[in-house]
């Protein structure tokens, strides 16, 4: 098998790419990707486009997604529509979906990748900080899924992939807010898979582990996060890459997974089973007076 080239830490397209799947796996499909202007969402958009898909990438920052769209189109030759949208505001979601449908005439795939996170012990977590994460992660996922269902998926079918996390699987310290929000999304995945399956809609979650070159790793692991996690105490002792996550999402969104619905696909090298909780870091946080 051809060796995959190293990933790119920054939000840039890969300098070279060797297809592991058929290049036309998503030929002429249209994917709506929240959080598509950076990190994992950006790489998902790139990998989808390298497999024949057109994309709509959305973020609150129009300059960010506009710049990302230019890079994606230049690297892949596929169409990419950048839109500004706040997943927490249903009217904004409706307007963005309407604009995407006007541009492409359809949406085949929804990737819910928008998220918010930070480190904080539960004892210092403000009511507003907790609500903000739930609003983005949980309510945002519902808002976009519900709007797309009403405007297209109910009558035409579709695929939804929710990007979640492994935090709730082992009670990760300093992550109550994100763990609870993402666990709710995993529950939503199962409920929607059951309720919307008869309309030919598949719904799955993908839970990444520690992934290099992402804002999440930088924010949660600090400025030296990549070197800090170089030798993880996990079955596959290294950080994952954005490309590896994107390939897994590609599988779930493609006809290869045509009979897969309602699952949480964990892509973390097995680290959720072996990576220890950092109780010492929890104590450091709790000894400070800072509250979020």
Swiss-Prot record:
Belongs to the short-chain dehydrogenases/reductases (SDR) family. 2,4-dienoyl-CoA reductase subfamily. A motif (Microbody targeting signal) lies at residues 290-292. InterPro entries: DECR2-like, NAD(P)-bd_dom_sf, SDR_fam. It holds the Pfam family adh_short_C2. It comes from Rattus norvegicus. It is found in: Peroxisome. The modification Phosphoserine is found at residue 287. Keywords: Acetylation, Fatty acid metabolism, Lipid metabolism, NADP, Oxidoreductase, Peroxisome, Phosphoprotein. Its EC number is 1.3.1.124. Gene3D superfamilies: NAD(P)-binding Rossmann-like Domain (3.40.50.720). It is an enzyme of class 1 (oxidoreductase). One of its GO terms (molecular function) is trans-2-enoyl-CoA reductase (NADPH) activity. NADP(+) binds at residues 35-40, 60-64, 86, 182, 208-214. One of its GO terms (cellular component) is peroxisomal membrane. Auxiliary enzyme of beta-oxidation. Participates in the degradation of unsaturated fatty enoyl-CoA esters having double bonds in both even- and odd-numbered positions in peroxisome. Catalyzes the NADP-dependent reduction of 2,4-dienoyl-CoA to yield trans-3-enoyl-CoA. Has activity towards short and medium chain 2,4-dienoyl-CoAs, but also towards 2,4,7,10,13,16,19-docosaheptaenoyl-CoA, suggesting that it does not constitute a rate limiting step in the peroxisomal degradation of docosahexaenoic acid. This is Peroxisomal 2,4-dienoyl-CoA reductase [(3E)-enoyl-CoA-producing]. Substrate binds at residues 60, 88, 118, 126-128, 219. Monomer, dimer and oligomer. It catalyses: a (2E,4Z)-dienoyl-CoA + NADPH + H(+) = a 4,5-saturated-(3E)-enoyl-CoA + NADP(+); a (2E,4E)-dienoyl-CoA + NADPH + H(+) = a 4,5-saturated-(3E)-enoyl-CoA + NADP(+); (2E,4E)-hexadienoyl-CoA + NADPH + H(+) = (3E)-hexenoyl-CoA + NADP(+); (2E,4E)-decadienoyl-CoA + NADPH + H(+) = (3E)-decenoyl-CoA + NADP(+). The modification N6-acetyllysine is found at residues 151, 291. The keyword Lipid metabolism applies. GO terms for biological process: fatty acid catabolic process; fatty acid metabolic process; unsaturated fatty acid biosynthetic process. Coiled coil: none annotated.
């Amino acid at each position: 098998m051809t060796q995959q080239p190293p990933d790119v830490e920054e939000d840039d397209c890969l300098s070279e790419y060797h297809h592991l799947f058929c290049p036309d796996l998503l030929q002429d499909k249209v994917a709506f990707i929240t959080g598509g202007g950076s990190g994992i969402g950006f790489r998902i958009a790139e990998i989808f486009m390298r497999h024949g898909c057109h994309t709509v990438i959305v973020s609150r920052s129009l300059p960010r997604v506009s710049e990302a769209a230019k890079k994606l189109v230049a690297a892949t030759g596929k169409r990419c529509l950048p839109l500004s949208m706040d997943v927490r505001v249903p009217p904004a979601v409706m307007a963005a979906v309407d604009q995407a449908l006007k541009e492409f005439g359809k949406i085949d795939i929804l990737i819910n990748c928008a998220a918010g996170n930070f480190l904080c012990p539960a004892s210092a977590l403000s009511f507003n900080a907790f609500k903000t994460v739930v609003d983005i992660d949980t309510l945002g996922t519902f808002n976009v899924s519900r709007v797309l269902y009403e405007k297209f998926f109910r009558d035409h079918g579709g695929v939804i992939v929710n990007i979640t996390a492994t935090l709730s699987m082992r009670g990760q310290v300093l992550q109550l807010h994100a763990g609870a929000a993402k666990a709710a999304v995993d529950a939503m995945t199962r409920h929607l898979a059951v309720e919307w399956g008869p309309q030919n809609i598949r719904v799955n979650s993908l839970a990444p582990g520690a992934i290099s070159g992402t804002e999440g790793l930088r924010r949660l692991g600090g400025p030296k996060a990549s070197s800090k996690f170089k030798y993880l105490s996990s079955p596959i002792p290294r950080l994952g890459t954005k490309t590896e996550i994107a390939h897994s999402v590609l599988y779930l969104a493609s006809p290869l997974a045509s009979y897969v619905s309602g699952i949480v696909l964990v892509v973390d090298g097995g680290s959720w089973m072996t990576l220890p909780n950092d109780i010492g870091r929890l104590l450091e946080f709790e000894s400070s007076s800072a509250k979020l």
